Amino acid sequence: MKFALTGGGTGGHLSIAKALAIELEKQGIEAIYLGSTYGQDKEWFENSPLFSERYFFNTQGVVNKSFFKKIGSLFLQAKAAFKAKEILKKHQITHTISVGGFSAGPASFASLLNKIPLYIHEQNAIKGSLNRYLSPKAKAVFSSYAFKDKGHHVLTSYPVQNAFFDFARTRTEIKHILFLGGSQGAKAINEFALLNAPKLTKQGIKITHICGPNSYEQVRFFYQELGLLDKIELFAFHNNITEVMHRADLCVSRAGASSVWELCANGLPTIFIPYPFASNNHQYYNVLEFEKENLCYVAPQNELLPKKLFEVIRKLNQKDDQGNKNLTAISNQLQQKIAKDGAKTIIETILSA
């Protein structure tokens, strides 16, 4: 038995691949990885000991490109698919798991050509174009969101790494706010943090701001101009995000699926600012169910004003009829919404098929 993991491009897809690879390693199952030279795949897995072999193809996405660029991208995908076909045959792969993203294309199609069972994990509430096409052909499609289109869909807990559960806690007071710009940085969140920082620090609320490497120098300059650089924690990125989340009582974040469920596992109440240009507006739909259940706050980017933060803080500090703060109730309910060992459940479901 030997698995191939494929897909990525961005941290959200790749974090799922990593969680699944860790689980395969725990069960003593060998795995290889097939991704792209474009995006973050090599950065994550080029030297990863989780895989016995790693392959990166010269491929790019097809969505949001001009007609001629789409043709070029499709040609690269097809060329890579035939290479992947030989690689899967060489390694005698018995199962392929796609975590989505454009870099999953070659190995997914190669698996179908080689008649290798293909399993898909769809991280978002709205499927990407590749997964929409492949779902009816896959052995199973795992997701934390309910889908009604064609395909064998299996509802599972999101494969969040156990550290997010281990560092979870119930929040009782807002003393520390985390502004999470993500690995790519988020201009809207960075500006929102800077606009609110003077009032927050004046009220004695601590700030941790992860602004992204491309924005670090500019954001640092503005904090310095505000005279706040020595009063806040500013990082381009952070290697121990679980520890950072653990210290925070409220978060401001984009709504990529991995971030949403990691914050959920940590029990950290969050104001989500969905990236408005995400394909099919999927970031908004990632948190729609949470919003309907009053488990988060959603602020559209085009309606984002500094006062929104303090409106949310006031609401979180309000108490219900039993005298419990909304902050505490939400924090508790978030921890109950997601179960541990999502990756283990997915792998065991595949092995028992």
From Swiss-Prot:
This is UDP-N-acetylglucosamine--N-acetylmuramyl-(pentapeptide) pyrophosphoryl-undecaprenol N-acetylglucosamine transferase. Pathway: Cell wall biogenesis; peptidoglycan biosynthesis. The keyword Metal-binding does not apply. Pfam families: Glyco_tran_28_C (PF04101), Glyco_transf_28 (PF03033). The gene is murG. Gene3D superfamilies: Glycogen Phosphorylase B. One of its GO terms (biological process) is regulation of cell shape. Belongs to the glycosyltransferase 28 family. MurG subfamily. PANTHER family: GLYCOSYLTRANSFERASE, UDP-N-ACETYLGLUCOSAMINE--N-ACETYLMURAMYL-(PENTAPEPTIDE) PYROPHOSPHORYL-UNDECAPRENOL N-ACETYLGLUCOSAMINE TRANSFERASE 1. Keywords: Cell cycle, Cell division, Cell inner membrane, Cell membrane, Cell shape, Cell wall biogenesis/degradation, Glycosyltransferase, Membrane, Peptidoglycan synthesis, Transferase. It comes from the Bacteria. It is a peripheral membrane protein. One of its GO terms (molecular function) is UDP-N-acetyl-D-glucosamine:N-acetylmuramoyl-L-alanyl-D-glutamyl-meso-2,6-diaminopimelyl-D-alanyl-D-alanine-diphosphoundecaprenol 4-beta-N-acetylglucosaminlytransferase activity. Its EC number is 2.4.1.227. It is an enzyme of class 2 (transferase). One of its GO terms (cellular component) is plasma membrane. It catalyses: di-trans,octa-cis-undecaprenyl diphospho-N-acetyl-alpha-D-muramoyl-L-alanyl-D-glutamyl-meso-2,6-diaminopimeloyl-D-alanyl-D-alanine + UDP-N-acetyl-alpha-D-glucosamine = di-trans,octa-cis-undecaprenyl diphospho-[N-acetyl-alpha-D-glucosaminyl-(1->4)]-N-acetyl-alpha-D-muramoyl-L-alanyl-D-glutamyl-meso-2,6-diaminopimeloyl-D-alanyl-D-alanine + UDP + H(+). UDP-N-acetyl-alpha-D-glucosamine binds at residues 10-12, 124, 183, 283. It is found in: Cell inner membrane. Cell wall formation. Catalyzes the transfer of a GlcNAc subunit on undecaprenyl-pyrophosphoryl-MurNAc-pentapeptide (lipid intermediate I) to form undecaprenyl-pyrophosphoryl-MurNAc-(pentapeptide)GlcNAc (lipid intermediate II).
